[in-house]
């Protein structure tokens, strides 16, 4: 429940390591799969409404991509579902080659640079927290 009670304050926000131990536990798990030796912090945001469905995208430094046409990627991408209820159809997380059904307490860790999205859904509780650890703070 601690994830659900945290104030995510809208869109992506930057956090230095040590600020949110409960969220950083997901980064500790990701350390088993990705090198975090140069980790300086992470972006984090949450979504719990079916009114916003992320389209096909890759997590990246948005300013560099738009203004300088360069890709800078996080160390990895972490998606955590603290609560999913009454999801009867849709809401799946997908990439080119996999579809993952959201479930309460499910954690997804994936390599950077993988395009992904979410299938539309209605009338369900689908709380998701996205965490992107970085070797440098995105611009």
Residue positions per predicted region:
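Fe(II)/2-oxoglutarate oxygenase catalytic core
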Residues: 1-107, 113, 117-139
């Amino acid at each position: 429940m601690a994830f659900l009670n945290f104030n995510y304050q809208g869109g992506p926000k930057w956090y230095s390591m040590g600020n949110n131990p409960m969220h950083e536990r997901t980064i500790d798990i990701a350390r088993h799969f990705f090198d975090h030796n140069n980790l300086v912090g992470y972006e984090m945001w949450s979504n719990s409404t079916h009114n916003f469905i992320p389209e096909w995208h890759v997590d990246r430094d948005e300013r560099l991509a738009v203004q300088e046409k360069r890709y800078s990627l996080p160390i990895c991408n972490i998606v955590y579902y603290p609560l999913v209820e009454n999801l009867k159809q849709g809401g799946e997380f997908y990439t080119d080659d996999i579809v993952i059904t959201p479930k309460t307490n499910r954690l997804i860790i994936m390599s950077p640079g993988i395009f992904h999205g979410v299938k539309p859904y209605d009338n369900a509780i689908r709380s998701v927290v996205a965490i992107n650890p970085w070797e440098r703070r995105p611009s």
